[in-house]
């Protein structure tokens, strides 16, 4: 029986993906959000899903309401109205926890690499069998007949605790979200609690010291590059400008050679995790091998475009570990080009906590340009950190730029520009694209 769903904060990456999935399953879907453009709304608009401004008139007692986790009575009129009038609603993660019970569910958790790995697993499995999925880049697919459900499992504020999937991958554990987690131990405890809820198989990166301490009632399979101590091992790596080729062994048994058209060592590990999970779940590895070859990536994860013969890469990287992985991927694909990083720090708390790590990561580039820190709606700028504090720690050529003047980026020949951040770094990217386009017009 089709239902009517209203999403409070429908442009959020998880929310938009869920809205698309429910829409494709035959339900009526609408939502509300701020008017500012966000990259997820294109998919919603293409699907014909109505996006409204926040207004208490949007709410109806006959609809099922799903609320974004950031919204509270003091910052959202719809939440305030619902609370005052006894209108029930579920948070995104609460809804998802009950929704997935109708499927064989496969989660992807981890401090970094969740979205790319969820996208890869969704791509392969949906080409093998009918599958519904939710990816953190705002992409969702729903099928009323699907047996399997693939989803991204987010650790922030322990949102993954309502989830009890049959299978899960955990890519890594790292200290992030310092506005919520107090320490690496706190992060570990959250992941360990989640791991205890997996029922059939847990796949963890075996070269992560924290993940080696994880416990679960489900069988734990380790994957990695090193033969000793890992169940699924990637070896014989060949990294080229067209992607990566590698061989996978399971406890000494050769599972064959695989190719992915994506870049960076981290993507080889993501693929090894996907191979391990699907092999253990009983899927034909020849089909897995075939469909890995066609996985082109997910939105805002090493997304490339060429403007006026200039290569521009857009990536969501906003943590030092992610920056290193993204720059490594850029060097693999463009070994003869200068790698120029354009980075916008995301949240003041993260910038303070990881300032030295950010500098170390950005020094992997040949030149670095910094945008002003993008503050989260959850925090207040007390003036404790400025982007210049990060700039002072970078030893490569560097400069702070504004969105109104990105012309310093033109000081490079034969360069690849890697724009990274989780805030509005894309406005800097678009400004640079307009500048490049105008150069072409002026020449003509």
UniProtKB/Swiss-Prot annotation:
Q: Which Gene Ontology BP terms does the record give?
A: cell division; cell wall organization; peptidoglycan biosynthetic process; regulation of cell shape
Its cellular-component GO annotations read: cytoplasm
Q: Which UniProt keywords apply?
A: ATP-binding, Cell cycle, Cell division, Cell shape, Cell wall biogenesis/degradation, Cytoplasm, Ligase, Nucleotide-binding, Peptidoglycan synthesis
Q: What is the reaction catalyzed?
A: UDP-N-acetyl-alpha-D-muramate + L-alanine + ATP = UDP-N-acetyl-alpha-D-muramoyl-L-alanine + ADP + phosphate + H(+)
**Where does the record say this protein resides?**
Cytoplasm
Residues reported to bind ATP: 110-116
Pathway annotation: Cell wall biogenesis; peptidoglycan biosynthesis
Task: Note the Gene3D superfamilies from the entry.
Answer: Mur ligase, C-terminal domain (3.90.190.20), Mur-like, catalytic domain (3.40.1190.10), NAD(P)-binding Rossmann-like Domain (3.40.50.720)
* An annotated Gene Ontology molecular function: ATP binding
User: Which EC numbers does the record give?
Assistant: 6.3.2.8
Tell me, in one coarse class, where this protein mainly resides. cytoplasm
Going by the entry's taxonomy, the superkingdom of the source organism is recorded as Bacteria
**Record keyword Amino-acid biosynthesis present:** no
The protein's role, per its UniProt record? Cell wall formation.
Concerning its family, UniProt says: Belongs to the MurCDEF family.
* Protein's recorded name: UDP-N-acetylmuramate--L-alanine ligase
């Amino acid at each position: 029986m089709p239902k009517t769903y209203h999403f409070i904060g429908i442009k959020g990456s998880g929310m938009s993906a869920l809205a698309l999935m429910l829409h494709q399953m035959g339900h009526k879907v609408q939502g509300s959000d701020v008017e500012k453009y966000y990259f997820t709304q294109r998919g919603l608009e293409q699907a014909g899903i109505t996006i409204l401004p926040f207004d208490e008139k949007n709410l109806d007692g006959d609809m099922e309401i799903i609320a974004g986790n950031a919204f509270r009575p003091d910052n959202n009129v719809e939440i305030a109205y619902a609370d005052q009038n006894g209108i029930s609603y579920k948070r995104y993660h609460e809804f998802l926890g009950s929704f997935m019970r109708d499927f064989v569910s496969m989660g992807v958790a981890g401090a970094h690499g969740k979205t790319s790995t969820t996208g890869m697993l969704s791509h392969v499995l949906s080409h093998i069998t009918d599958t519904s999925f939710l990816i953190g880049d705002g992409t969702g697919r729903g099928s009323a007949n699907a047996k399997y459900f693939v989803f991204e499992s987010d650790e922030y504020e322990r949102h993954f605790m309502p989830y009890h999937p049959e299978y899960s991958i955990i890519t890594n554990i790292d200290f992030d979200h310092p506005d919520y987690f107090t320490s690496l131990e706190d992060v570990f405890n959250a992941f360990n609690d989640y791991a205890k809820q997996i029922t059939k198989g847990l796949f963890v990166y075996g070269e992560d010291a924290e993940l080696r301490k994880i416990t679960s009632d489900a069988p734990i399979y380790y994957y990695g590059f090193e033969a000793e101590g890992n169940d699924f091992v990637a070896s014989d790596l060949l990294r080229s400008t067209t992607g990566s080729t590698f061989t996978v062994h399971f406890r000494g048994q050769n599972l064959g050679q695989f190719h992915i058209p994506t870049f960076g060592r981290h993507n080889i590990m993501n693929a090894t995790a996907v191979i391990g999970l699907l092999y253990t779940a009983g899927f034909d590895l020849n089909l897995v091998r075939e469909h890995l070859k066609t996985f082109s990536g997910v939105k805002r994860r090493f997304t490339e475009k060429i403007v006026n013969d200039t290569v521009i890469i857009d990536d969501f990287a906003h943590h030092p570990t992610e920056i290193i992985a993204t720059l490594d991927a850029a060097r693999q694909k463009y070994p003869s080009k200068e790698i120029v990083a354009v980075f916008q720090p995301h949240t003041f708390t993260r910038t303070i906590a990881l300032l030295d790590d950010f500098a170390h990561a950005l020094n992997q580039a040949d030149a670095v340009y910094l945008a002003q820190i993008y503050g989260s709606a959850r925090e207040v700028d007390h003036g404790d950190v400025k982007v210049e504090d990060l700039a002072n720690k970078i030893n490569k050529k560097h400069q702070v730029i504004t969105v109104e003047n990105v012309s310093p980026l033109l000081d490079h020949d034969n360069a690849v520009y890697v724009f990274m951040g989780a805030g509005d770094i894309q406005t800097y990217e678009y400004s640079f694209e307009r500048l490049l386009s105008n150069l072409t017009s002026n020449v003509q």
